[in-house]
UniProtKB/Swiss-Prot annotation:
UniProt cross-references to Pfam families, sorted A to Z: Ribosomal_S2
One GO location term (cellular component): cytosolic small ribosomal subunit
Highest taxon of the lineage: Bacteria
Biased composition (Basic and acidic residues): 278-295
Alphabetized InterPro entries for the sequence: Ribosomal_uS2 (IPR001865), Ribosomal_uS2_bac/mit/plastid (IPR005706), Ribosomal_uS2_CS (IPR018130), Ribosomal_uS2_flav_dom_sf (IPR023591)
Naturally occurring in which organism (per UniProt): Rickettsia peacockii (strain Rustic)
The UniProt record lists the keyword Ribosomal protein: yes
UniProt family annotation: Belongs to the universal ribosomal protein uS2 family.
Chain residue ranges for the region called Disordered: 263-295
Molecular function terms from GO: structural constituent of ribosome
Protein name listed in UniProt: Small ribosomal subunit protein uS2
A biological-process GO annotation: translation
Keywords carried by this UniProt record: Ribonucleoprotein, Ribosomal protein
Keyword Translocase recorded: no
Length: 295
């Protein structure tokens, strides 16, 4: 029995995953993931999305199962809160505001900023220590802490590079992707029709702007990570009755060997006939409903 969450055409279609960008904004490197176009908007081939999502979810599951660390990254407004919510749900790490250059490649500097944040936290929580500061100084420290939290809250317990990067919007997060590539950190990413999938180990063709789509992705990612965590804890002899209490970021502290790159599905021949039929029927039904509404 599969340990990863199941995903189907209908769930993706209902979440609007099939809607790409206007045809004028496309990236030709995404051609093999595009089914066609409707009203000057590219339609993403959800048959491939289903297959590739399963590959990506398995990569997430295997990483956490082997005590690896996952870093979720998306700083776009509509994804910011969702990324944090689901990363915390599965006890992993996240960057959901500004990506600071060198977050992966210059970890020493980032670690220094995290140390500053922890010191500010300690000082501001110590009422006795605060008596030695003026109101202006305390206000300055509070603002400094808040500024650091925006960028570092999701990685303050990350003590080394992650074992897998999960990205929504490869265009916006190109710096994070470039740093991961330099450090040979595998990448899972949602790739829209205007994206460049070249450096992505586990691409998932899909809408990277819709809140419903983003929430669906993150829910699946978190569920896969939790399944991996459960297997890891079983192997360690942890009481599964206490599973819900184990969301401490320190749980995933061991390094794991790098996962082999999954074979990428880029041709419809890799998609089974049942999935082909399901996708085409779903699109036809959507068209019929649209025509009925406009009648």
């Amino acid at each position: 029995m599969s340990k990863i969450p199941s995903v189907n055409i209908k769930a993706l279609l209902d979440a609007g995953v099939h809607f790409g960008h206007k045809t004028s904004r496309w990236n030709p490197k995404m051609a093999s993931y595009i089914y066609g176009e409707r009203d000057d908007v590219h339609i993403i081939d959800l048959r491939q999305s289903v297959a590739l999502m399963s590959v990506a979810l398995n990569a997430i599951y295997e990483t956490v199962k082997k005590d690896g660390k996952i870093l979720f990254v998306s700083t776009k407004i509509q994804a910011s809160d969702i990324i944090a919510e689901y990363a915390e749900k599965c006890g992993q790490y996240y960057v959901n505001h500004r990506w600071l250059g060198g977050m992966l490649t210059n970890w020493k500097t980032i670690a220094g900023s995290i140390e500053k944040l922890n010191k500010l936290d300690k000082t501001l929580e110590n009422e006795e220590a605060l008596m030695g500061y003026t109101k202006k100084e305390i206000l300055y420290m509070s603002r400094k802490k808040d500024k650091l939290l925006l960028s570092l809250a999701g990685i303050r317990n990350l003590n080394s590079k992650p074992d897998l990067l999960v990205v929504i919007d490869t265009n916006k997060e190109h710096i994070a992707i470039n740093e991961a590539v330099k450090l040979n950190v595998p990448i899972v990413a949602v790739v829209d029709t205007n994206s460049n999938p070249d450096n992505v180990d586990y691409p998932i063709p899909g809408n990277d702007d819709s809140i419903r789509s983003i929430r669906l992705y993150c829910s699946l990612f978190a569920d896969a990570a939790l399944q991996g965590l459960e297997e890891s804890m079983k192997a360690s002899g942890v009481d599964m009755g206490a599973m819900q209490e184990h969301t401490d970021k320190g749980l995933t502290s061991k390094n794991v060997s790098k996962l082999k790159q999954a074979k990428k599905f880029s041709k419809t021949k890799n998609i089974d006939e049942e999935t082909n039929t399901e996708f085409e029927k779903a699109l036809n039904d959507a068209d019929e409903n649209k025509n009925s509404d406009n009648a």
